[in-house]
């Protein structure tokens, strides 16, 4: 597994399965156990079963997991671990297999025996999946026999039965999510593939295979429906993969690991020439997007080590200090800790609360990173030079920020000249259209409902923030009006509570230039105002492509297919009826009434909300599309060209 092996404590049999409470509540309140009954909850069912298999891998008894999406969106998870115990569990007098799948908080994760580390959702995984499945079948290969149980919505439909002989060990779970419980029953292969790849990186040497066997996927190339992943380098390879579209400052990934008692910590990091930090932290294989004690320990140690090293080699004066943020500019880092009693804050495990892990990670990084820098002075100087440059840029950004604040304080609410604000002051009721060009801005201003709609026209070439530091952003005359109009600051100082509008709508033409402006703005929001996207405040307006007129009747269409359908409908079955069809060449060519009717009227318009389902994937996409490297961008365009909208103007 990791370079420091995680071993099982005691035997894994029925005595290690401890019952805490019943299953009744799960179907009543599924959100308490899997977060939601939306698509994310649907996928969470798979993660729970896979987590159980990974617990066997962590204990040193499993090196292969296979996940299949079968026809009908049935899931099958197979592992070659020891198999769930089938002997009688003393506390209940029932087979341990039955207890694991029918009793909440039953598993080898409680009571001091069984697993030392475990990632299952507070030990409720298997039974919750069972409760929320239309049907579930589990087969255990153990002691030369195949033991099978069947369930429906948490109830036993077939008692544990021996159905055959076997020469292997392991568990196979097959289940179909219950349509009574989930809004969406279709699995996204890429979502599952991303999660399985993550698990494979975090558990060096574990092979995870995922395959899409659904009929709708049969004609897809194998590269889009089957992946087999095994990374002997573990999180080292994870960092290399995360940095693949970036230019690394040093060729080797810095790897550090250590152990105290039953707790293990691994850290892998590499700097690149970009300006953004990417830190992914995990506890018992569970991603902790809000960080926690392991991240705190790492950040503190990194800042101290770099400052001490800088003073030692005289790149820093004794009274100089580089901030933690500057030390992390261009950093890609993966932190993985494994511990017995993981204390996650919140049911969704977003943050790790164990204070002893902060000390462990701090000590490991303080010791091993210091040694690395001593042995690799050239790399040390490059990292410090980057941090010092970031420090100078941050100071310039601070001065620019203070200058803006002073001007605002002297001149009142110094809103941008071109902003046409609305009358309403409640941000929950207001929206701002960020519009490309003065002509479209003029039509939008005349066509809007000024009670709640504000207009901010943008003009000229916008800054690509993927290639710029914060000081350049503050001084940029194209982005400054956006920052000022929204009123919530940027970067670490961004405060959603100060936002002046809760709908930020990007309105640009449906051509190449419009797409470029949209992408530049989204890159800016992602890098400097990410909570804006995370809170669901960012939208893209979808203007129509066609106007169809018959006499005094006018309709619009958003695609070629819709144009043909609307045209046929307006003819009413008479092919001789004349329909005038014109194509909107751009927002600037629409008159104010047309713009209101098609793109701004809340009753009729189409808005596309920008979401952030996968921050890592979004990070990678922005780096590819807007970064310095040409080759990854070329590959991305070639791979995704089939999904692009056909633009002929």
Residue ranges and their predicted role:
Residues 1-13, 23, 47, 55-57, ...:
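GHKL-family ATPase ATP-binding module
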Residues 55-56, 83-84, 512-513:
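Residues immediately C-terminal
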């Amino acid at each position: 597994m990791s370079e420091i092996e995680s071993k099982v404590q005691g035997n894994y049999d029925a005595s290690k399965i401890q019952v805490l409470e019943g299953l009744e509540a799960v179907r009543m309140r599924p959100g308490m156990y899997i977060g939601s009954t939306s698509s994310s909850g649907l996928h969470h069912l798979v993660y729970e079963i896979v987590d159980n298999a990974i617990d066997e891998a962590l204990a040193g008894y499993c090196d292969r997991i296979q996940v299949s999406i079968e026809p009908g969106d049935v899931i099958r998870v197979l592992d070659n671990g020891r198999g769930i115990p089938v002997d009688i569990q003393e506390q209940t007098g029932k087979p341990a297999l039955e207890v694991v799948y029918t009793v909440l908080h039953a598993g080898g994760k409680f009571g001091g025996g069984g697993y030392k580390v475990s990632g299952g959702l507070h030990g409720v995984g298997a039974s919750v999946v069972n409760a929320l499945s239309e049907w579930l079948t589990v087969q255990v290969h153990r002691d030369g026999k195949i033991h099978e149980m069947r369930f429906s919505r948490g109830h036993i439909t077939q008692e544990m039965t021996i159905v055959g002989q076997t020469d292997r060990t392991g568990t196979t779970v097959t289940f179909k999510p219950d349509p009574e419980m989930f809004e969406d029953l279709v699995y996204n292969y890429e979502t599952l593939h991303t999660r399985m790849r993550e698990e494979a990186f975090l558990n060096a040497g574990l092979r995870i295979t995922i395959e899409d066997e659904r009929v709708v996927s049969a004609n897809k190339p194998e590269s889009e429906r089957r992946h087999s992943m095994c990374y002997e380098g573990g999180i080292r390879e994870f960092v290399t993969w995360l940095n693949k579209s970036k230019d690394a400052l040093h060729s080797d990934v810095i790897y550090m690991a250590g152990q105290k008692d039953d707790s293990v910590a691994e850290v892998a990091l590499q700097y690149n020439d970009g300006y953004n930090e990417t830190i992914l932290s995990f506890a018992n294989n569970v991603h902790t997007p809000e960080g926690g004690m392991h991240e705190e320990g790492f950040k503190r140690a990194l800042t101290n080590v770099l400052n001490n090293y800088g003073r030692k080699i005289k790149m820093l004066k004794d009274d100089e200090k580089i901030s933690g943020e500057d030390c992390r500019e261009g950093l890609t880092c993966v932190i993985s800790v494994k511990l017995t009693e993981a204390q996650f804050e919140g049911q969704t495990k977003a943050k790790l609360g164990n204070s002893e892990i902060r000390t462990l990670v701090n000590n490991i990084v303080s010791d091993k990173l210091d040694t690395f820098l001593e042995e690799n002075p050239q790399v040390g100087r490059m990292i410090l030079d980057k941090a010092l440059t970031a420090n100078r840029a941050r100071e310039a950004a601070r001065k620019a920020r203070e200058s803006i604040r002073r001007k605002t304080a002297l001149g009142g609410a110094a809103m941008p000249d071109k902003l046409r604000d609305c009358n309403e002051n409640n941000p929950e009721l207001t929206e701002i259209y960020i519009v490309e060009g003065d002509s479209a801005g003029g039509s939008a201003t005349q066509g809007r409902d000024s009670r709640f709609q504000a207009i901010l026209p943008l003009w000229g070439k916008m800054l690509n923030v993927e290639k710029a530091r914060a000081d350049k952003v503050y001084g940029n005359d194209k982005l400054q009006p956006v920052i000022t109009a929204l009123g919530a600051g940027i970067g670490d100082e961004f405060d959603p509570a100060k936002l002046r509008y809760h709908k930020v709508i990007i309105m640009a033409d449906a051509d190449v230039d419009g797409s470029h402006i949209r992408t530049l703005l989204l890159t800016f929001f992602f890098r400097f105002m990410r909570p804006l996207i995370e809170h669901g405040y960012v939208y893209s307006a979808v203007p129509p492509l066609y106007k169809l007129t018959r006499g005094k009747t006018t309709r619009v269409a958003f695609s070629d297919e819709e144009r043909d359908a609307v045209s046929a409908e307006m003819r009413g079955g008479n092919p001789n009826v004349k329909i005038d069809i014109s194509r909107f060449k751009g927002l600037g060519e629409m008159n104010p009434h047309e713009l209101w009717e098609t793109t701004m009227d809340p009753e009729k318009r189409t808005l596309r909300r920008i979401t952030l389902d996968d921050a890592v994937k979004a990070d990678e996409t922005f780096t590819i599309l807007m970064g310095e490297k040409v080759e990854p961008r070329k590959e991305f365009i070639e791979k995704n060209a089939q999904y692009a909208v056909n633009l002929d103007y």
